[in-house]
C-alpha cells in the first residue's frame, strides 16, 4: 500500500509492515492516515476503499475526502443513477467544466459536473459525514480517426469539500497520476513485478529501497531522461550517482 503527494509527485509512504501487513486495506488505511500529516489536504481514494469509516477518519484528521463511488456502495450508486441520468447531462444547468487532450494518436474529452447534496443524497449524508459535493466525470476517448473506436466512461464521486467543477476536475485528474507516476514507474522503470524475492521482510525492504531510488532519480533534473535511463546512468557513472545523492544531501 502506498500514499502519494500529488503536488510533488513522489510517494512518501511505503508498504505498511508489522501488524498492518496482516490487516486488510480497509482496516490499514485508517491507520495509515493516522501516520500522515494531512490537515488541510484533500485525500482522494479509489472506489474499493470508499467506506464510511475511512471518510470519518479523514475528517477527524482535519482533512477533506474525495471518494470514487461504484457498486460496493449500492445506495450511493443508485442515487447517482437516479439523479444524474445520462440523458439529462447534455443540458446540465449546474456548474460544469470541460477539458480536451490529444496526443499519441488518441483524443480524450472530459466533462466534469458538480452539485450540492440533493434528493436521496440528503438522507445518505447522515451516513456519510461531512458530505457536501457530488461529482460526475464523463470521458469520451477515441483511438485514431475512426469514430467507431470512441468509448465513454462515467465515474461518480462524493466529497466533503465544497468544490467547483474545475477544482473537482483537477483533483480527480491528479489522482490518476498515481497510476502513471508511481505504479508505472515501479513496474516498468524499476521492474518491481519481475522481483521474485519473497523470504521474510525482504520484499518489503527492497520495495522501500526502490521508492527511495525512484524519488532520488525523479528529483534529479540535470539529465533530461526517464527514470529507467537515469537508473542505468547512475549504475555506470560514479560521478552521476554522486550527483543524484548530492541533490538530497546524501553524498
Each PLM stretch: what is its role?
Residues 70-173:
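An anionic, glycine-rich sequence signature occurring as long contiguous blocks
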Residues 65-68:
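Short hydrophobic alpha-helical runs that function as membrane-insertion/retention elements
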Residues 158, 162-197:
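Short amphipathic alpha-helical "interface-anchor" segments enriched in bulky aromatics
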Residues 1-4:
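Methionine residue identity
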Residues 55-63, 85:
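Short, surface-exposed basic-aromatic patches at helix termini and helix-loop junctions that form
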Residues 25-45, 50-53:
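Conserved, well-structured functional cores that handle cations and Mg-NTP chemistry
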Residues 93, 185-251:
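A short, flexible helix-boundary coil/loop motif
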Amino acid at each position: 500500500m502506498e500514499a502519494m503527494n500529488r503536488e510533488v509527485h513522489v510517494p512518501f509512504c511505503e508498504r505498511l509492515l508489522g501488524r498492518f501487513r496482516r490487516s486488510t486495506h480497509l482496516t490499514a488505511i485508517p491507520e495509515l492516515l493516522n501516520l500522515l500529516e494531512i490537515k488541510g489536504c484533500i485525500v482522494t481514494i479509489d472506489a474499493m476503499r470508499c467506506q464510511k469509516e475511512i471518510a470519518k477518519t479523514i475528517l477527524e484528521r482535519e482533512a477533506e475526502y474525495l471518494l470514487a463511488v461504484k457498486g460496493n456502495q449500492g445506495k450511493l450508486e443508485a442515487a447517482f443513477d437516479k439523479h444524474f441520468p445520462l440523458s439529462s447531462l447534455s443540458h446540465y444547468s449546474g456548474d460544469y467544466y470541460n477539458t480536451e487532450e490529444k496526443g499519441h494518436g488518441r483524443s480524450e474529452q472530459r466533462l466534469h459536473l458538480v452539485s450540492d447534496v440533493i434528493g436521496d443524497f440528503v438522507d445518505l449524508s447522515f451516513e456519510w459525514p461531512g458530505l457536501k459535493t457530488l461529482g460526475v466525470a464523463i470521458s469520451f476517448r477515441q483511438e485514431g480517426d475512426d469514430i467507431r473506436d470512441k468509448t465513454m466512461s462515467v465515474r461518480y464521486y462524493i466529497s466533503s469539500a465544497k468544490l467547483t467543477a474545475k477544482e473537482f476536475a483537477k483533483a480527480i485528474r491528479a489522482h490518476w497520476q498515481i497510476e502513471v507516476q508511481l505504479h508505472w514507474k515501479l513496474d516498468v522503470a524499476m521492474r518491481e513485478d519481475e522481483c521474485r524475492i519473497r523470504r521474510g521482510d525482504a520484499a518489503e525492504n527492497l520495495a522501500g529501497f526502490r521508492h527511495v531510488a525512484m524519488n532520488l532519480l525523479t528529483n534529479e533534473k540535470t539529465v533530461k531522461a526517464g527514470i529507467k535511463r537515469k537508473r542505468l546512468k547512475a549504475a555506470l557513472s560514479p560521478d552521476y550517482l554522486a550527483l543524484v545523492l548530492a541533490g538530497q544531501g546524501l553524498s
